[in-house]
């Protein structure tokens, strides 16, 4: 009887060990698997049924007087490639666009306006960027995806409404040096004040500043799906 109990115990222990060791690769694969990305417009529509604020909207439908300079629709960017075909439309989640509208309203009282360089960015574009610059300080690792892919991040600056000129921020867009960092302080007071104005008004309205890029801000809630949908599909549904 004792032998039977011992044998059962040994078999049970063996099964436990085998199960544990065979589970390790599965957990490892899950940890290192590619992120889930929505590529079909129909699946995107399903994803926002439970939350209408997830809707992707053309930014000017929410903030009509905002300015665009969509760099990735030109060759004037770090890739030196025209990534987007359309330079007149860009998109964000509805909740994020509304928050940006509040920022714009506050700045307009100072005769200032936001200028948008980039907003929604398809996941496949992030993959191309990563091929050129594998540095997470400046380009999102596709294994994680980015706020741009989720429709909740925006690259922007401030301009004077009267002149149309950008406020001096010390560097241009896509400057991958320490000078572009939020914590870089070896700059004239005018530049520091301009950066502080942008950061303050964005954070006041629910955005978080990226430490390595003074122009990059993302929404405080990242619980949004990664998207790899051509912007022209959103464009067809502009209300």
Short names for language-model regions:
Residues 1-33:
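Bacterial Sec-dependent N-terminal signal peptides
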Residues 122:
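Segments that shape or occlude catalytic/ligand-binding pockets
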Residues 28-117, 132, 136-212, 218-239:
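Extracytoplasmic cell-surface/polysaccharide-interacting catalytic and binding patches
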Residues 2-6, 69, 216:
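Intrinsically disordered, low-complexity sequence elements enriched in Ser/Thr/Gly/Pro
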Residues 126:
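Aromatic-lined carbohydrate-binding/catalytic grooves of carbohydrate-active enzymes
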């Amino acid at each position: 009887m004792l032998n039977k109990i011992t044998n059962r115990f040994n078999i049970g222990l063996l099964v436990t060990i085998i199960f544990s060791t065979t589970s390790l690769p599965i957990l490892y694969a899950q940890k290192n698997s590619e992120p889930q990305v929505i590529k079909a417009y129909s699946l995107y529509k399903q994803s926002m049924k439970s939350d209408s604020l997830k809707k992707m909207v053309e930014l000017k439908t929410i903030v009509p007087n905002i300015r665009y300079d969509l760099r990735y629709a030109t060759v004037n960017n770090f890739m030196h490639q025209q990534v987007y075909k359309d330079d007149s439309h860009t998109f964000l989640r509805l909740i994020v666009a509304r928050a940006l509208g509040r920022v714009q309203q506050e700045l307009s009282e100072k005769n200032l306006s936001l200028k948008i360089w980039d907003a929604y960015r398809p996941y496949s574009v992030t993959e191309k960027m990563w091929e050129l610059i594998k540095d997470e300080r400046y380009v999102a690792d596709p294994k994680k995806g980015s706020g741009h892919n989720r429709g909740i991040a925006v690259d922007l600056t401030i301009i004077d409404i009267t002149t149309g000129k950008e406020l001096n921020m010390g560097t241009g867009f896509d400057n991958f040096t320490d000078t572009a960092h939020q914590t870089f302080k070896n700059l004239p007071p005018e530049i520091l004040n301009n950066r502080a104005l942008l950061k303050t008004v964005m954070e006041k309205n629910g955005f978080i500043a990226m430490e390595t890029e003074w122009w990059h801000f993302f929404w405080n809630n990242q619980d949004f799906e990664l998207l790899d949908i051509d912007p022209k599909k959103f464009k067809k549904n502009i209300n």
